[in-house]
UniProtKB/Swiss-Prot annotation:
One cellular component (GO) term of this entry: plasma membrane
Family: Belongs to the ABC transporter superfamily. Lipoprotein translocase (TC 3.A.1.125) family.
Annotated SUPFAM superfamilies: P-loop containing nucleoside triphosphate hydrolases
Organism listed in the record: Wigglesworthia glossinidia brevipalpis
Binding site for ATP: 43-50
Domain annotation ABC transporter: ranges: 7-229
Protein name: Lipoprotein-releasing system ATP-binding protein LolD
Topology relative to the membrane: Peripheral membrane protein
EC number of the protein: 7.6.2.-
Length: 229
């Protein structure tokens, strides 16, 4: 890891209003993510882990505070500029795979590269190589409904890496994987981390996985704490 800060959030708070009552989900969060750093986020269900991922990745706006990527304030960008920044620099692995049902596994994985104006041939070549990495060589032409839940999640992992992102945001990436596939995910994560210097921010309940990352942070009562596992 080097000391280049990729993403930084400063004094970030997120609140919601329900029945005229203000609920504080995240309270004055400060965090820096460095180039090639791997971070796990743990905490109880409903503690705000996924909310933090959405804020950091520009999918949602903080109520107060500032989030910057390479010094550029994300929530001040136009919708189109923010989408461009996300597609070019961020990869996403959601708790639910969000694969498009009418497209093949190969086409799903290639989609972000096609949105990024890669040629169809180049995008599919990249997708094919990643699908080999995650053990889905024999599933490339299948529709998502024709493969298992674990295989769909592996396809989603491959999709997150296709644009060679600077940061991958992962929300319970091993939640639908068996032990063998979880180990393969970690090996792939480390391989990409070492070779591409990709940073990973991983929300997980998998303590074994959390222990293997550079550091672990815990959200508790809306605050972010460093956790020693």
């Amino acid at each position: 890891m080097n000391n280049m800060v990729l993403l930084k959030c400063k004094n970030v708070t997120k609140t919601y209003k329900t029945n005229k009552k203000k609920i504080i989900i995240l309270n004055n969060i400060n965090l820096s993510i460095y180039n090639s750093e791997t971070i796990s986020i743990i905490g109880d269900s409903g503690s705000g882990k996924s909310t933090l991922l959405y804020l950091l990745s520009g999918l949602d706006n903080p109520t107060t505070g500032k989030i910057t990527f390479k010094g550029k304030e994300i929530n001040k960008l136009s919708s189109s500029d923010r989408s461009y920044l996300r597609n070019k620099n961020f990869g996403f692995i959601y708790q639910f795979h969000h694969l498009l049902t009418d497209f093949s596994v190969l086409e799903n994985v290639a989609m972000p590269a096609l949105i990024g104006n890669f040629s169809v041939k180049h995008a599919k070549n990249l997708a094919y190589k990643l699908l080999l990495e995650v053990g889905l060589k024999n599933r490339i032409n299948h529709k998502p409904s024709e493969i298992s839940g674990g295989e769909r999640q592996r396809a989603a992992i491959a999709r997150s890496l296709i644009n060679n992102p600077k940061i991958v945001f992962a929300d319970e990436p091993t939640g639908n994987l068996d032990n063998t596939s979880s180990k393969k995910f970690f090996c792939l994560l480390k391989k990409v981390n070492v070779e591409k210097k990709t940073a990973f921010l991983v929300v997980t309940h998998n303590i074994k996985l959390a222990k293997k990352l550079d550091k672990t942070l815990e959200i508790k009562n809306g605050k972010l704490y460093k956790k020693n596992l």
